[in-house]
Amino acid sequence: MEVFEELWKTVNEEYLYADFNGLDWNAVHEEYRQRIEAGLSNLDFYTAMADMIYSLGDDHSQFHTPEQMAVIDAKYAGELDYVGIGVIISAVPERQRAVILGVFPGSPAEKAGLQIHDSILTVDGQPILDAEGFLTTILRGPEGTTVSVEMQRPGEAPRTVQVSRQRISGSVPVPSMVLTTPGGKRVGYILVSTFMDSTVDDQVGAALEAMTAKGPLDGMIIDNRINPGGYQDVFVGTLRYFLSGVAGHFINRQRESTLDLGKAKDINGSQTVPMVVMVGPDTVSFGEISSGILQDTGRAYVIGETTDGNVELLLEYNFSDGSSAWIAHDTFRPLNHPEANWEKTGIVPDLNVPAAWDLYTLETDPAVKAALDYFDNK
């Protein structure tokens, strides 16, 4: 009951929207108090708390159990540790598959030839998604065991590969490479799949160093299309390679605060290199805000699809049992267009180019092609 009361009070006092999106928050308190007093197991209690936060309807605020927070904390520290094949995947329920967003270097998945953009259809003959379209855990299992993975590369027929399970540890990978435009320009490409890992900004810096080792770049692509956001310090640390100073303002029920990126972290011209940022429906939270800031300041040309509009700043509130709630506390107003409401409009690209992640490889991706053409014509 103590955690419930703490959680309800936190939302009551700190939630961004004073009308609770039309929800009678006092009635919610009474409903859940009665359910808890009637008797709930630990699992049912945590499910109820998650449901209570979900009822706010902002599609952003969330509740995490102590076990979930342990995983989140490990990810932030760059200390993921589990047994599996070494991929980061996301469900694509409309095509009954999961698409690979990242492959851990040296992992069994990499050794088996799996790449980002590949889809996983089945594992040992069982669907990778459950009946509701959510990811299953069948890729995980005892260390040293082997699984049959039915995969499909965009544009190719499905095939099956044998992949062993081993202990996977370390940071979320940040893939990068130098691409060449049809006109011969050197363009850097960095896939930023999250700001949840505290090493991401350093990895972006290392990628910039590596890509400019043989000379300056003519352009830079930041691919935020699968970036669901994460922690503010990682978002700021990444953005500072390309921009500095005041970038906008956070606004909540009590006050307005300035987002100051601080001093620039230029790496071999990263503050001035022409930029393209790619966005889409899976660009969320600080993924959206970072893309919008680069567009708003004139620092980058944006290519892709309009984002869904989910730019609330979540604050983390920790409770006595180790659980945590991430509650929408602020919304964002860009520096040069403070009248803009990205929560309603999303980030609207300068050039609309649909490109579903699981339907194209990097080589065939129409958004990447459009970006390379942009640099040639600039």
Language model features by range: what are they?
Residues 19-97, 146, 155-175:
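Extended, small/polar residue-biased N-terminal targeting/export presequences
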Residues 2-13, 17-30, 34-47, 77, ...:
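C-terminal recognition in membrane/secretory proteostasis and scaffolding
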Residues 110, 133-320, 374:
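Cleft-lining beta-strand/loop regions that shape enzyme active-site pockets
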Residues 257, 265, 318-319, 327-333, ...:
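C-terminal regions of proteins
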Residues 40, 47, 80-86, 93-98, ...:
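Extracytoplasmic
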Residues 2-9, 26-30, 34, 43-54, ...:
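Solvent-exposed, polar/charged alpha-helical surfaces in well-ordered, non-transmembrane soluble domains
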Residues 8-20, 33-41, 50-61, 105, ...:
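Sec-exported extracytoplasmic/periplasmic mature domains
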Residues 109-131, 221, 302, 339:
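Conserved PDZ fold ligand-binding element
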